[in-house]
Amino acid sequence: MPARWGCLFPGKYPCQTGLRHMSDRASVIYILDDDNAVLEALSSLVRSIGLSVECFSSASVFLNDVNRSACGCLILDVRMPEMSGLDVQRQLKELGEQIPIIFISGHGDIPMAVKAIKAGAVDFFTKPFREEELLGAIRAALKLAPQQRSNAPRVSELKENYESLSKREQQVLKFVLRGYLNKQTALELDISEATVKVHRHNIMRKMKVSSIQDLVRVTERLKDSLE
């Protein structure tokens, strides 16, 4: 094992035992780290079990060039000079990208790990770590990826849905999100309660949701792009 890999995997490299079932050529494992030696070590490990890999050393290049239609996961370094891993995670969320993320860090930063997990990360590893643990996290992430993509329309699509609302429907939506009843909304906008009900029906249809809870969820995702 080359010496530089020892900082990642304390043991024999690579471990092949019992991992063939993880091979999924339809999935892409993205690796974002500013250390080329780490990129080489991680990509070699992932390729050894038959998975496709795309490596990036720049956060901005990754955010601009990544194939967003591909299903897979992202192995993400926490500390990078251009942009932190948490910032990358936040930007992906703002873009509506639901790719599962596995964080790696050279420091035992518990508060940062808590933030990452709370924001939806699959796992958080501190170097060195066992390769079996990372491969297990990749396995879990690949199980999550199709479900997340099928259940989460992109922000661009949600914004398009929002912009299809009439000015009055957008006004009604604001009161719906504040928890106003139809009667209260009608008084605020000086329209009939029946008209409010029609607007609410149209809002739900255009936003492609079936419940107020879903409406709140999608508009929360839109908040940053509408401000």
From Swiss-Prot:
Annotated GO CC locations: cytoplasm; protein-DNA complex
Protein keywords: Activator, Cytoplasm, DNA-binding, Phosphoprotein, Transcription, Transcription regulation, Two-component regulatory system
Domain Response regulatory: 28-142
Processing and modification events after translation: Phosphorylated by TodS.
An example Gene Ontology molecular-function term: transcription cis-regulatory region binding
Position of the signal peptide: none
Modified residues (4-aspartylphosphate): D77
Transmembrane segments: none
Residues annotated to bind DNA: 182-201
SMART domains: HTH_LUXR (SM00421), REC (SM00448)
Activity control summary: Phosphorylation by TodS probably induces conformational changes, which allow or alter the interaction with RNA polymerase in a process assisted by the integration host factor (IHF).
Inducing stimuli: Constitutively expressed. Is under catabolite repression.
Compartments it resides in: Cytoplasm
GO BP terms, alphabetized: phosphorelay signal transduction system
Coiled coil: none
Residues of the HTH luxR-type domain: 158-223
Pfam families tied to this protein: GerE (PF00196), Response_reg (PF00072)
Matching CDD domains: LuxR_C_like, REC_FixJ
Assembly with partners or alone: Monomer.
Main function: Member of the two-component regulatory system TodS/TodT involved in the regulation of toluene degradation. Phosphorylated TodT activates transcription of the tod operon (todXFC1C2BADEGIH). Binds specifically to three boxes in the tod promoter region in a cooperative manner. Boxes-1 and -2 are pseudopalindromes and Box-3 is a half-palindrome.
UniProt name for this protein: Response regulator protein TodT
Organism field: Pseudomonas putida (strain DOT-T1E)
Record gene name: todT
